[in-house]
Amino acid sequence: VESKTSKIYNQMKPKIAADIFNQMIGEGKIDDVFDIILKLKESNVTQIMKFLSVPNASILTQMLENFNINKEKKD
């Protein structure tokens, strides 16, 4: 299911994806947004981040940073 979701978001215009993510985060679903972002192409995430609200982009950036730090510790 999630691979299908990421495929949909990878094909979506970045502004539309960002609008949906902003809405989802506003509804308290930031973990769901983060899970989707982890499965997207990096170039698409970059474009989507440009359109997210500043607070949401900041939170997701911190989550990505923490995820990468934890991933490096495991490797």
Question: Where do the protein language model's features map onto the residues?
Answer:
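Hydrophobic packing positions in regular secondary-structure scaffolds
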Residues: 1-75
